[in-house]
Curated annotation (Swiss-Prot):
<feature type="repeat" description="HEAT 10">
    <location>
        <begin position="388"/>
        <end position="426"/>
    </location>
</feature>
<dbReference type="GO" id="GO:0007052">
    <property type="term" value="P:mitotic spindle organization"/>
</dbReference>
<feature type="repeat" description="HEAT 12">
    <location>
        <begin position="466"/>
        <end position="504"/>
    </location>
</feature>
<dbReference type="GO" id="GO:0000159">
    <property type="term" value="C:protein phosphatase type 2A complex"/>
</dbReference>
<dbReference type="Pfam" id="PF22646">
    <property type="entry name" value="PPP2R1A-like_HEAT"/>
</dbReference>
<dbReference type="GO" id="GO:0040028">
    <property type="term" value="P:regulation of vulval development"/>
</dbReference>
<dbReference type="GO" id="GO:0043186">
    <property type="term" value="C:P granule"/>
</dbReference>
<keyword id="KW-0963">Cytoplasm</keyword>
<dbReference type="GO" id="GO:0017151">
    <property type="term" value="F:DEAD/H-box RNA helicase binding"/>
</dbReference>
<dbReference type="InterPro" id="IPR011989">
    <property type="entry name" value="ARM-like"/>
</dbReference>
<dbReference type="GO" id="GO:0005737">
    <property type="term" value="C:cytoplasm"/>
</dbReference>
<dbReference type="GO" id="GO:0005829">
    <property type="term" value="C:cytosol"/>
</dbReference>
<dbReference type="GO" id="GO:0072686">
    <property type="term" value="C:mitotic spindle"/>
</dbReference>
<feature type="repeat" description="HEAT 9">
    <location>
        <begin position="349"/>
        <end position="387"/>
    </location>
</feature>
<dbReference type="GO" id="GO:0005635">
    <property type="term" value="C:nuclear envelope"/>
</dbReference>
<dbReference type="GO" id="GO:0046627">
    <property type="term" value="P:negative regulation of insulin receptor signaling pathway"/>
</dbReference>
<feature type="repeat" description="HEAT 7">
    <location>
        <begin position="267"/>
        <end position="305"/>
    </location>
</feature>
Amino acid sequence: MSVVEEATDDALYPIAVLIDELRNEDVTLRLNSIRKLSTIALALGVERTRNELIQFLTDTIYDEDEVLLVLAEQLGNFTPLVGGPDHVHCLLLPLENLATVEETVVRDKAVESLRKIADKHSSASLEEHFVPMLRRLATGDWFTSRTSACGLFSVVYPRVSPAIKSELKSMFRTLCRDDTPMVRRAAAAKLGEFAKVFEKTAVIEGLHSSLTDLHVDEQDSVRLLTVESAIAFGTLLDKANKKKLIEPILIELFDDKSWRVRYMVAEKLIEIQNVLGEDMDTTHLVNMYTNLLKDPEGEVRCAATQRLQEFALNLPEDKRQNIICNSLLNVAKELVTDGNQLVKSELAGVIMGLAPLIGKEQTVSELLPIYMQLLNDQTPEVRLNIISSLDKVNEVIGAAQLSTSLLPAIVGLAEDGKWRVRLAIVQFMPLLASQLGQEFFDEKLLPLCLNWLTDHVFSIREASTLIMKELTQKFGGQWASTNIVPKMQKLQKDTNYLQRMTCLFCLNTLSEAMTQEQILKEIMPIVKDLVEDDVPNVRFNAAKSLKRIGKNLTPSTLTSEVKPLLEKLGKDSDFDVRYFSEEAKNSLGL
C-alpha cells in the first residue's frame, strides 16, 4: 500500500492526538504515532512536514529502539510527503542520526532507507547533500557511523563526478583498514557490491588491494566475508586477471586456519567452482574440495557434503566419472561412518544423486554398498534421507537389481521404530509397484501395505489409504476386489472404532479408481453396514464417505443407493452425524 493510500484510510484519525502521542511518555503510544507518521505528514502538508515535522523528529531522535526502527523504515518512504525529489535531501539528517545509533537493526534499517532515497536524488543533489553526509559518517568518531557508511558507497558512486569517485574510493579503502574490526567487517561485506558498480577497468586499481588486505585480516569474522567478495571480483575480471589475482586468494581461504572461514568456503563452493572451474586445474580444485570433506570440524564437513552432488554435476563431462569414482567416492565411503550424525544425514540426502552421473555398472559396484550401509544406520534421519533418494537409484539400476539388492532392507524398514521412516517407505510403494510388477508386488510388498492400514500412527494409516488408489489405478479394479476389499471387510468388523474409520478412509480413495459396478458390489455394502455403527464418529465419517463415493456414481444410482442412507443419518441422535449428512446431501444435490 502506498503512503498516500494509507493516509487516506486514516484520514479521520485525529491529527492533534497523533502529534501529542509523539511526545507521550508511554512507548506504546509513541510507537503507534510513529507508525501513523505519514498521516501526520499528509495533514501538515509538504512545507510544514519539511520545516516542522522533520525538524522535530531530528531533534527528538533519542528513543526506544523499537520506535527508532519504525521511524527509520517510515522515513525511507517519505519522499512524496516532503515535496518529491527536489526536497528529499531534508530526510538525510534524521536518517544520518539513526545510522549512528548503537542498536544494529536500527542502523541497518536507516542505511536501507538512505539507499532507497539516494535513488531519488539528482546527481547534483547527491554531490551537494548526500556525499557530505557520507563523508561525515565515514569519518565519524564512533564505529557505528563508519559501519553504516560502508553500505552507502555503491548507491552513490555510479552517479557522481570523477573527482568525487576518486574520493569515495579513497574513503572506502580507509574503512577497509579501520582499527575497529566491526568496521572492517562491514567494509568486507560490501566490498563485492561496491566492486560491481566500478568501471571494469578500475576494479583492480581501485579495490583489489583492499580485498588482499581483508582476506588476511587478523579477525576470522572479517576474512570469512571476503569469500563472497572474492567471488564477486572473479565475475568482474578477465580470465588472466582472475587467474593471477583472485585464484590465489580463494586457494588461501580454502586452507584458512579458522573453521568458520572454511565453512563459508564450503557454503559458497558451487559459486567458487563456477568462477574458477574453467580456468583452474580440475585436480587442484577437487583436492581442495576433498580436504573440506575431510575437515576436522563437523560443520565444515556438513556444508561440504551438502554440495557433493552439485559439485560433481559441474565437473567437466569428460573427467566427471573418473573423478567421482576415484576421488569423491573414496571420501564418501569414509563419511558413511562419520562420528557426526549431521554429516551422515547430509551424505544420505545427496549420495544417490551421483547414480545418473556414473551409470548402472558403477552405481551397483560403488554406490549400492554405501546406500545399504546408510539404509541400516542407527540414526533415523540418515535412514529417512537415504530412502527419499530411492527413485534416483531406481532410474539407474532397474527392477532386477532393485529386487535382489534393496528389497530386503526396504522390507526391514517397513516396520522401523521411527514412524517418519515407515512413512517414507509407504510413499514409495507406488513407485516400487510400477518397477517390480504386480506378481512380485503381491508376493513381497502387498502384506506390508495391508499391515500399515492398522499402524498405531494416524499419518501411516492415512498415507496407506492414499496409496491404495494409486495401486488400484496401476493394477486395476479386479486386483483391488481380490486383494484390498477382503482387508476392508475385516476392518469393518474390527472392535477398535479407529480401524473401522480407516476402512472408510480407504474406501473413499478406492472408489475413485473403481467402476460404478465395483463400487455398488464391493464398497457400498461395507458403507451401509458402518452407517449403523454404534460410534457417532464412525457414522459421521460414513456420511462423509458417501459424499466422496457419491461423486463417482450416476444420478439415478445416487437416488436409489445413497439418498436413503443419508436420510437415515439425517435423523441421527448425534448433531455431528446430522450435520455431515446434510452437507453430503447438499454437495450431491440430493
